[in-house]
């Protein structure tokens, strides 16, 4: 485990100790807060480079999983050992989220702890794999706009109705997770606990986290996600971004990557049931989707890709084709 020179060290070690995890190895070079982040180019658990020291220690200790929390301990990155090759495989936020979600739903169902009318909350750009998983367990799936504050808002709504226990779990693709209604934001300490508990559950069955993910893919379908972005610098760039979004609304593509567009959802209208937002979603006949939105913090247009197929390779190929098509659409010319 590495707190990436941030605040996660003490609370993470404490919670794992209280849960009985005895073989926890903390990266010594990144154990204590360091405002200069001397050992890191960028202290972000989404960046593979941030795991350099942790992966080195993991190989030395033959660890099963590798965890990194960001400096303010609200996001969690995960690597898991491939027992066939001995290498460590990076989990996306979607992979970690759906694995933990399915484990929580499985255990609550098995122990009779599932509340009435349970709900799981994700964002509109998070993996579609949550749909068949929640359907399998009879759990309502609530999709909200991008940003964990909207997941927290749903907890508030349930609390206002007098039923906060209905909230089971929430996550977003950008490495944010939360179980329970104790806070209103993503919580990496909570997520570490859930990841380790999930890993222990599968280890007791002789499975690694990677084995578990692949088993879920085989059961529910190979859902794969990808993210691309296009940068537009300066004031002219902002105008160009606005023009691109306007152009998409007036002349939406009929096909993307050779697949017919079955439905277009414009979140900047009143018909979605969500607050209006500058987001466009293209749902294709093959179950894939492409979403386009301007970044709220950078001069970028982000493109979210999601595909499902009968193999990982086939789903990745669809996403690659959609990414190539996005570059050619009249909306995005760099």
Segments from the language model and where they lie:
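Active-site pocket-lining segments that scaffold enzyme catalytic pockets across diverse folds
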Residues: 1-21, 28-30
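Gly/Ser/Thr-rich loops at beta-strand to alpha-helix junctions
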Residues: 3-9, 73-75, 125-128, 235, ...
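Short Gly/Thr/Asp-enriched flexible loops that form oxyanion-binding sites at enzyme active sites
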Residues: 12, 74-93, 130
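N-terminal small/polar loop signature for handling phosphorylated ligands or for N-terminal nucleophile
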Residues: 20-78
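Phosphate-binding and adjacent anionic-ligand microenvironments
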Residues: 59, 63-65, 87-89, 107-293, ...
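Well-ordered alpha-helical segments embedded in enzymatic catalytic cores
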Residues: 50-53, 100, 150
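Catalytic or ion-translocation cores adjacent to nucleophile or general acid/base/metal-coordination motifs
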Residues: 89-104
